[in-house]
């Protein structure tokens, strides 16, 4: 796996699923391929994206700044600086300085990532902030190692939280989660269907599913009534894709 592929993988792992994630993936691909060279416009676009947490925006801004060539005097962006200040916690800053001293002696991506993984996400973000604000300089490979370690820490905690929700025995939470997943699957079907004539059927199925979820929410239903809703939708989606000649091995 190439270095940039690895960076893209880690960064995208902390971006919430949805149309915005696809857009960010495209931007990252363009940046890494050297197709997008306007850092100013890229940062302005990132700043105004909804849904993303300030820290995720900060990490993306850091990656864009590392990758896109820019004039030496280009102004640092406040939204990235604020996100990478470790919540203003002096302990995070102390640890970030210690980590920075270790990273300065490192030259490889994997070496930097290994060192960084023993620090908390707050200290890692602060260390990125030091580098972003030009208070410290490391090689681009080392900076990417720091980025990937930070994303791994965040993705780990997101995964723990997600696992807790998925394994919860509370029927109300499970019911709502199934309806949310069905709704987002329906939305994805509508987007994939596009405007072709064969898409009418998929659009119809998706629309019915969304209306059903809205009705279930409006009138209140038994927690088991949503069981199988998402799977039914996915089966419809896969049947539609087969007819369209699109093969999607793993959607579930």
Swiss-Prot record:
GO terms for biological process: viral budding from plasma membrane. The keyword Oxidoreductase does not apply. A motif (Nuclear localization signal) lies at residues 101-105. Keywords: Host nucleus, Membrane, RNA-binding, Viral matrix protein, Virion. It is a peripheral membrane protein. GO terms for cellular component: host cell nucleus; membrane; virion membrane. It is found in: Virion membrane; Host nucleus. GO terms for molecular function: RNA binding; structural constituent of virion. SUPFAM superfamilies: Influenza virus matrix protein M1. Residues 1-164 are annotated as: Membrane-binding. Plays critical roles in virus replication, from virus entry and uncoating to assembly and budding of the virus particle. M1 binding to ribonucleocapsids (RNPs) in nucleus seems to inhibit viral transcription. Interaction of viral NEP with M1-RNP is thought to promote nuclear export of the complex, which is targeted to the virion assembly site at the apical plasma membrane in polarized epithelial cells. Interactions with NA and HA may bring M1, a non-raft-associated protein, into lipid rafts. Forms a continuous shell on the inner side of the lipid bilayer in virion, where it binds the RNP. This is Matrix protein 1.
């Amino acid at each position: 796996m190439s270095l940039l592929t690895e960076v893209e993988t880690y960064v995208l792992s902390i971006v919430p699923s949805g149309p915005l994630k696809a857009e960010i993936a495209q931007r990252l691909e363009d940046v890494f391929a050297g197709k997008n060279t306007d850092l100013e416009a890229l940062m302005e676009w990132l700043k105004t994206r909804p849904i993303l947490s300030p820290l995720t925006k900060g990490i993306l801004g850091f990656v864009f700044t590392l990758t896109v060539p820019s004039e030496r005097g280009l102004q640092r962006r406040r939204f990235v600086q604020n996100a990478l200040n470790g919540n203003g916690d002096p302990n995070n800053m102390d640890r970030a300085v210690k980590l920075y001293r270790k990273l300065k002696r490192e030259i490889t991506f994997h070496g930097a990532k290994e060192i960084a993984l023993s620090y908390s996400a707050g200290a890692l973000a602060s260390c990125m902030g030091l580098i972003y604000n030009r208070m410290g300089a490391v090689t681009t490979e080392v900076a990417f190692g720091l980025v990937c370690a930070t994303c791994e820490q965040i993705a780990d905690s997101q995964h723990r939280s997600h696992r807790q929700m998925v394994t919860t025995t509370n029927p109300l939470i499970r019911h709502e989660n199934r309806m949310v997943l069905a709704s987002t699957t329906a939305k994805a079907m509508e987007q994939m269907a596009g405007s072709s004539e064969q898409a009418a059927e998929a659009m119809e199925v998706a629309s019915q599913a969304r209306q059903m979820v809205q009705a279930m929410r409006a009138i209140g239903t038994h927690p088991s009534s949503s069981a199988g809703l998402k799977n039914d939708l996915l089966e419809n989606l896969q049947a539609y894709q087969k007819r369209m000649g699109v093969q999607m091995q793993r959607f579930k």
